[in-house]
Swiss-Prot record:
It comes from the Bacteria. This is Protein SlyX. InterPro entries: SlyX. Belongs to the SlyX family. Gene3D superfamilies: 1.20.5.300.
Length: 72
């Protein structure tokens, strides 16, 4: 009877281990996918920021547009 109990416990542990290994593989795949998506989003954000900066005129006038100070 003790032998059956031990065998049952070992079988239960093996089953749990197999489930945990599958879960870890699934989580690893999800993290890898998310990392790729995040890298793409970062690149898209960088491009969008560059486009916004390029489309907005500067609030600082160029040297040629500036009027000389009054003491000149």
């Amino acid at each position: 009877m003790h032998n059956e109990s031990t065998e049952h416990r070992i079988a239960e542990l093996e089953s749990r281990l197999a489930f945990q290994e599958t879960t870890i593989e699934d989580l690893n795949a999800a993290i890898t996918k998310h990392e790729l998506e995040l890298a793409k989003m970062r690149e898209q954000l960088k491009i969008m920021v560059e486009k916004i900066k390029a489309s907005q005129p500067s609030m600082i006038a160029s040297q040629a547009e500036e009027t000389p100070p009054p003491h000149y």
